Design a protein with these regions (language model features):
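Gram-negative outer-membrane beta-barrel transporters
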Residues: 715-801, 837, 857-861
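C-terminal beta-signal and adjacent terminal beta-strands/loops
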Residues: 792-802, 806, 818-862
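Structural signature of Gram-negative outer-membrane beta-barrels, strongest in the C-terminal barrel
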Residues: 405-409, 419, 514, 533-535, ...
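Acidic, small-polar-rich N-terminal luminal/periplasmic segments of exported/outer-membrane proteins
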Residues: 211-345, 349, 677
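Acidic/polar loop-and-plug regions of large Gram-negative outer-membrane beta-barrel proteins
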Residues: 384-388, 398-467, 477-514, 557-585, ...
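Signal-peptide-cleaved, periplasmic/extracellular N-terminal interaction regions immediately downstream
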Residues: 2, 6-9, 17-202
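Membrane-embedded beta-barrel scaffold of Gram-negative outer-membrane proteins
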Residues: 465-469, 473-479, 483-491, 671-731, ...
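Outer-membrane beta-barrel translocator/receptor signature
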Residues: 310-312, 323-402, 408-412, 458, ...
Length: 862
């Protein structure tokens, strides 16, 4: 394994483009300049006198927020204005490539006043210009791109004391298309530019006319790379600065792959497998051999049914995460990040139809509710009506998610989000992990035709952000989730020796209610100790879950032939049951992100949790358990050259066992520890990112049978998971995007009183890989035509750890074709093109997956 790591590291270093030094031009504070009397050349000279080197270095450490982008029509074309709230200094590097004029602005980010990132795009704003985009190129750089239809557009650069940086873009229809040439500056052309590239020279500003018009905010991100994420640190941290593997599946990948079950997005991440359950409804994802924890916008969530109607991106943090999120398995967590309100209007409608009577419609509306744009909203609504390749499965799902954000002041905002889900679902429990079931038709459902699962959820999320000053801010959030379920579910039972008869089919169900409460408060401070920079996070979390189940259960009379099924057998009911449980978690955590040197960063933190659990049947005295655990994490990142990050980390996790020994003593929580080292790289001018990780996880204190009394448990079991992973995502060349992964994993029982040592963990393949790539034609008559293809390989794996059935490996092949023009898009997605037969599993059951399916989508944006 180490040999493979060294070879992979060598490969990544070899393919990295040589680091290029670029000349940077600083723009002075806006209030110090006079747009009407100074040219760019003159105020560049002024900057050299006013900003000595030490001041410049100080500014470079601060990321300037550009809070708005506007476009004003002019007699030449259009002016694009990047507005800052405090008039801070900005830097610019201009170049041209092909038909594109490109400006990079280091130490700057597009951020709404509430801190959310945003993207701007205008299609065909003027004659001769096909597109203007303003995006966060990476975690510390804004990129402005102006694409010409026939050649490089003519762009001039100004600064305004009242507005910000201004890019004047000339129309090809303008009589003043060719500007008067200005004297060349003495600054050399940045190294690394092609011979045909040139640095655009500034001229006097053009006159403004008419009323300002704002560029349209792009509601959907169109990149495969995301430069930063909050899951790993609870702060917006560049992925390259995190000493743990974290992968982000952005909205564009979800859209290109035609994903309708949001957990399918994790197929693109190394070391993950889907663990289906309850008719492919439960969204359990195995990460590095363990069940993952689930978050929704950073709050603990249940994986039972996850609607993707308002999901912006999916973040997968690998390894233990108890340091910030409390009790969880050591493999990792999945965070579903929802869409936020935007300051400019954006409206989208999606209509999807597919095989097996699949129909889904969705709308996404956002924009301001007030003229001053202090009150913003977003509304996501979707409706799905679908059949299935499995018998007796019909689904009817309504999802509504409104969000409102109010900017109380420059330093305070409040967001109120609500989600409503009503799902009436057919039910499918799959079959037992027995090889005979692998030969039955894929459509066979052992459940009864009248089995059902009804779900109703209400989720309320209130978030407050307050900035005391530039160095201290508060974030506080409260979540309430109400879950109501009712069901009638058939259990498949065991198969007789004849390989075809089920004699012990049973059923269960009944109403279930759960109320979830969660409160998180984080205080984030930035300060220095000498030359060392700190970002300190102090947080408190409290959450409670109350659940009550009123169960019905029984058995079916007679036998069931899986090759000649007969449904409608009489049910013999058992007495009704009642079960209730309450879990209360209180956690306090501290984290410090330390910049020792510009290229050397330390992450250290710890969390202490108190967990109370009680359960009962409403008649006898409840069973109670009290646990506490401390979960530390420490990691370091070293960046020898700008594109490369070398990292190492140690992290830990815990899970309460809620059991007692024969002597009556409670079992200690199971503990997980991980050691991880890796390399992160940003290639092709930061358009492509790669992560190579090697890890070793040990989980201890696992309950296993007491050899002296088999009615009780002792916590001496141990399992291990170790492996190597590679993830790649980004844009190789204009229009050609890729997301790929590969991994080797060895997850096995290392100590147990019941299971043999070396037994593989359930649903943990020894190897897997994925590749999805798309290409969209960038110019010419076919501009907007896109094609995509994907391969998803999963190695063989154990379906059940007690009586192992090996599920065969498979390679699923997908493809897509799309056409995008102006504000509409049409797409066809082909899934499982070669109609292979493959399976997903959880710890107890196996589920056949869909054959070849065709799905078509029409999307319109306004």
């Amino acid at each position: 394994m180490l040999r493979s790591l060294f070879i992979s590291c060598f490969f990544i270093v070899v393919i990295i483009q040589p680091t290029q030094a670029k000349e940077v031009t600083e723009i002075s504070r806006l209030q110090e300049l006079n747009r009407s009397t100074r040219t760019v050349k003159e105020w560049l000279a002024q900057i050299e006198q006013q900003n000595p080197p030490d001041q410049g270095e100080k500014q470079e450490s601060e990321v300037v927020q550009v809070t708005s982008v506007k476009a004003n029509p002019t007699d030449k074309g259009v002016e694009v204005i990047l507005q800052t709230s405090l008039g801070q200094e900005l830097q610019v590097v201009n170049r041209s490539s092909g038909n594109n004029f490109i400006t990079d602005i280091p130490n700057a980010q597009l951020r709404l006043p509430n801190g959310d990132a945003f993207t701007f795009r205008s299609t065909k704003p003027i004659a001769g210009v096909s597109e203007i985009t303003v995006t966060n190129f990476d975690a510390q750089t804004i990129r402005v791109s102006v694409t010409g239809e026939a050649g490089v557009p003519i762009v001039e650069l100004f600064d305004s004391p009242d507005e910000g940086i201004i890019f004047s873009v000339a129309s090809s229809a303008s009589s003043a298309q060719q500007p008067q040439q200005q004297p060349q500056t003495q600054n050399p052309t940045p190294s690394g530019q092609s011979e045909g590239s040139q640095q655009t020279q500034p001229t006097q500003p053009s006159a403004q006319s008419d009323e300002p018009i704002e560029l349209v905010v792009t509601g959907e991100q169109d990149e495969y790379t995301v430069p930063e994420a909050s899951t790993a640190t609870k702060t917006d941290t560049p992925l390259r600065d995190i000493p743990q593997s974290i992968q982000v599946i952005p909205q564009q990948v979800i859209r290109d792959q035609g994903i309708t079950r949001i957990t399918d997005a994790t197929r693109n991440v190394s070391g993950t497998t889907l663990a289906s359950g309850y008719g492919n409804l439960i969204g359990d994802v195995r990460v590095r051999g363990f069940s993952s924890g689930f978050l929704r916008d950073g709050f603990a969530s249940q994986p039972f049914f996850i609607d993707g109607g308002n999901i912006e991106q999916v973040e997968v943090l690998k390894g233990p995460a108890s340091v910030l999120y409390g009790a969880s398995e050591p493999g990792g967590i999945v965070n579903y990040v929802t869409k936020k309100p935007l300051s400019n209007p954006y409206y989208a409608v999606d209509l999807t139809a597919g095989s097996y009577d699949f129909y889904k419609s969705a709308i996404d509306l956002t924009g301001p509710l007030s003229n001053d744009k202090l009150l913003l909203y977003r509304l996501n609504v979707s409706y799905e009506n679908s059949g299935s390749y499995r018998d007796f499965i019909d689904n009817d799902i309504v999802f509504i998610a409104p969000v409102v954000t109010y900017q109380v002041s420059d330093s305070t905002d409040i967001t109120l989000a609500y989600e409503y889900l009503n799902a009436k679902l057919g039910f499918d429990r799959g079959f037992r992990p027995v090889s005979a079931f692998l030969n039955v038709p894929r459509n066979l459902n052992i459940a009864e035709p009248d089995d059902f699962q009804d779900i109703e959820q209400h989720r309320l999320n209130l978030t407050l952000n307050h900035r005391f000053n530039q160095n201290l801010r508060l974030r506080s959030g409260f979540v309430y989730l109400s879950e109501k379920q009712d069901s009638l579910v058939t259990q498949p039972g065991e198969l007789d020796a004849d390989g075809r008869t089920l004699t012990d089919r049973s059923y269960f169900g009944g109403p279930s209610n759960a109320d979830n409460y969660a409160l998180q408060t984080d205080l984030i401070g930035d300060f220095k100790t000498g030359s060392i920079t700190h970002q300190l996070l102090l947080g408190l979390e409290w959450r409670k879950r109350d659940q009550a189940d009123r169960g019905i259960s029984g058995v079916y009379e007679g036998s069931f032939d899986i090759f000649n099924p007969a449904y409608g057998l009489p049910r013999i009911a058992d007495p009704n049951s009642f079960f209730e449980q309450t879990t209360i978690t209180t956690g306090i955590y501290l984290q410090d992100q330390v910049t020792l040197l510009p290229n050397l960063k330390l992450l250290a933190g710890g969390r202490y949790d108190f967990v109370e659990y009680s359960s009962g049947d409403g008649q006898s005295a409840p069973t109670e358990f009290y646990d506490s655990a401390f979960s530390p994490r420490i990691g370091i990142v070293y960046q020898p050259i700008e594109p490369i990050s070398l990292y190492a980390s140690y992290s830990s996790s815990f899970v309460p066992n809620n059991s007692r020994t024969a002597s009556g003593e409670p079992l200690e929580p199971s503990r997980g520890t991980q050691y991880e080292v890796g390399i992160k790289a940003e290639l092709f001018d930061k358009r492509l990112s790669a992560t190579l990780a090697v890890y070793d996880i040990t989980k201890t204190n696992i309950p296993t049978t007491d050899p002296d009394d088999d009615e009780f448990l002792i916590a001496v079991g141990e399992v291990k998971s170790r492996g190597i992973e590679l993830d790649i995502a980004g844009e190789i060349s204009p229009g050609w995007k890729v997301i790929a992964s590969g991994y080797l994993n060895d997850a096995f029982v290392s100590k147990d009183n019941n299971l043999p040592e070396g037994r593989r963990l359930t649903n943990a393949p020894t190897q897997g890989a994925s590749l999805w790539t798309t290409y969209e034609v960038q110019k010419g008559d076919l501009r907007g035509l896109g094609i995509g293809a994907g391969l998803f390989f999963v190695g063989d794996r154990t379906a059940n750890i007690d009586d192992p059935l090996t599920l065969p490996s498979y390679v699923r092949t997908d493809a897509s074709i799309s056409y995008k023009r102006d504000n509409w898009r049409a797409a066809l997605n082909f899934k499982n093109i070669f109609n292979i037969k493959y399976y997903e599993s959880n710890d107890f059951l196996v589920f056949p997956q869909a054959p070849f399916t065709l799905q078509g989508t029409i999307s319109v944006e306004f």
